[in-house]
């Protein structure tokens, strides 16, 4: 595996000539330039060879030979870079992955919204409270959450804090996933505890018992594969702040190709996917696996143009369409996209994001999501693919390993009146640990019905 040491002066900077949506307006451009220069000198957070490995795994997803589980915080926070937070999030994803692997009988590619998800696009540039108007909070990588003038000024030094927070997180994730913490038998024991304590546990008991029997059978045969003790885990985030992403773009010394070494996979969001704008241009220059969020306004023509721009060689594993339609629209909007893309001969991975199209404001003023809506969008996604004979490639979920109260519903039900108890998100509502595991068991049932 190669350390991407060399940086081309113009590496990944062609986007600078194009309009770039959702970029912060820094008051001190000299300070920004100094930060970019520092970032360009920093070591890579991931290696090109690892990005290629994920491309190969995503190719299997696109061909129907694997399933993607992508999840993590809506927006990471600097003050949440702690062993407990990271471990709980990873534990939840590993538990979900174990259930899905057994039920689907295909490898589950595990990718975190982690170690870089510190920025958020916003619908409005400013926020007004009690007659005071300040810049919107855009994530810890841009400005502070506190509603004060000082906190809300975009500060380029935060880009360096994002790099260091991401490095700390990745270091711990690598230790957990290779040091025995991710052992499959341990993960299964956690799932058994969940099944026992969950109000929905009875529904999941059969599947948990089957997994138990399979593990007991292997143990009786004297089988103890090394794969049981470690897990492959990749990082991903939205490539939103182009100054940061391009500063961490390197030339791979093996191939001469450009890689964004801030994460294994990056995606372009619904608000920044304009074909003739900077984000798509940046994504077209790097070799990482790329995701594109597709909302309900996406046309089949646009989807085909993304393929032309981002995957001209038609390489499975390069491009992932992350569909975020809303539970009430997925069954109407998705079929044409899948049909036209499939007819074009392109092999892309189709993933459902059942979170972003299902947000509403509760009477209390909290942004929330109904677990039943999230589940219904996933159901619609599976139904569409089943009817077309195509592969439902995976799920992309905003979740936490903590017992927060941000989304309503679930087996261990959260009510609207409970939202205030532990509403901790910096931006959008996340599924808590129990709701995430509920979702995994229910998606496992759907996959079996395919």
Curated annotation (Swiss-Prot):
A Pfam family per the record: DAHP_synth_2
Keyword vocabulary terms for this entry: Amino-acid biosynthesis, Aromatic amino acid biosynthesis, Transferase
Enzyme Commission number, as recorded: 2.5.1.54
Gene3D superfamilies: Aldolase class I
Region (Disordered): 1-20
Catalyzed reactions: D-erythrose 4-phosphate + phosphoenolpyruvate + H2O = 7-phospho-2-dehydro-3-deoxy-D-arabino-heptonate + phosphate
Pathway connected to this protein: Metabolic intermediate biosynthesis; chorismate biosynthesis; chorismate from D-erythrose 4-phosphate and phosphoenolpyruvate: step 1/7
Any GO molecular function: 3-deoxy-7-phosphoheptulonate synthase activity
Start-end of Polar residues biased regions: 1-13
GO BP terms in the entry: amino acid biosynthetic process; aromatic amino acid family biosynthetic process; chorismate biosynthetic process
Entry-linked PANTHER family: PHOSPHO-2-DEHYDRO-3-DEOXYHEPTONATE ALDOLASE (PTHR21337:SF0), PHOSPHO-2-DEHYDRO-3-DEOXYHEPTONATE ALDOLASE 1, 2 (PTHR21337)
Quaternary structure (record): Homodimer.
Entry similarity comment: Belongs to the class-II DAHP synthase family.
Name this protein carries in UniProt: Phospho-2-dehydro-3-deoxyheptonate aldolase
Annotated organism of origin: Streptomyces coelicolor (strain ATCC BAA-471 / A3(2) / M145)
Taxonomic classification: Bacteria, Bacillati, Actinomycetota, Actinomycetes, Kitasatosporales
Gene: aroH
